[in-house]
């Protein structure tokens, strides 16, 4: 069978604070090192403004009910305000700088890796479907020890759509040949994961305390 996992707060505990000054000081430094007269407070304000503006445009286009933005574009927008420019690599780098400075907690839940291994030995295929930014999430998956855990994954920033939009689920199904009749979604969020799975026509496990805390229920799926 195919089991689809969310990542953040399902397999790994994460807590980030984008409002504290320590988050934006290294971002200011990043721009200044490239000749742009940025200030941490101004960059933080621009980040929020440009994010909302770009997301509003995506919503107006109407392609998806729940569109997703590639956040690296926001950092390119910010550079233009200061008369500069960032290429794709630099935009991803400054996003990782901001993210790294914002992280308070990032760790795999105890027992999560063991759960995935048990599912694998029982013949399950494992997939990841996450509302996440590719610029930093793939690195965080590696840091938490899950780099080789999945048969495939999709991140919302790479697809332009996010959970609970059923189209995001269907993209995963189509790319990896997942059978929606037997697939199960495991996630901590009732709306995005459980509600999204229902909209896509698949079963789900609401792992509100993380997947490892619901290991018995998840493992039981492979016995049916």
Spans of features found by a protein language model:
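Asp-based, Mg2+/Mn2+-dependent phosphohydrolase catalytic module
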Residues: 1-5, 13-17, 32-41, 89-91, ...
């Amino acid at each position: 069978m195919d089991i689809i996992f969310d990542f953040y707060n399902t397999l790994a505990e994460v807590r980030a604070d984008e409002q504290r000054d320590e988050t934006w000081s290294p971002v200011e430094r990043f721009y200044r090192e490239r000749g742009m007269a940025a200030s941490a407070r101004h960059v933080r304000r621009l980040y929020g403004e440009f994010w909302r503006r770009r997301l509003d445009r995506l919503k107006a286009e109407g392609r998806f009910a729940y569109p997703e933005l590639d956040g690296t574009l926001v950092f390119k927008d910010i550079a233009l305000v200061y008369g500069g420019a960032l290429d794709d690599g630099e935009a991803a780098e400054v996003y990782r700088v901001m993210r790294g400075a914002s992280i308070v907690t990032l760790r795999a839940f105890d027992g999560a890796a063991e759960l995935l291994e048990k599912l694998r030995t029982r013949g399950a295929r494992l997939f990841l479907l996450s509302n996440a930014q590719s610029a930093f999430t793939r690195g965080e998956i590696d840091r938490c020890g899950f780099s080789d855990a999945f048969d495939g994954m999709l991140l919302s920033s790479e697809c332009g759509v996010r959970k609970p939009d059923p189209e995001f689920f269907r993209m995963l199904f189509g790319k990896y040949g997942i059978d929606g009749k037997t697939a199960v979604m495991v996630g901590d969020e009732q709306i995005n994961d459980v509600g999204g799975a229902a909209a896509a026509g698949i079963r789900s496990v609401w792992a509100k305390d993380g997947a490892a805390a619901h290991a018995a229920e998840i493992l039981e799926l492979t016995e049916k």
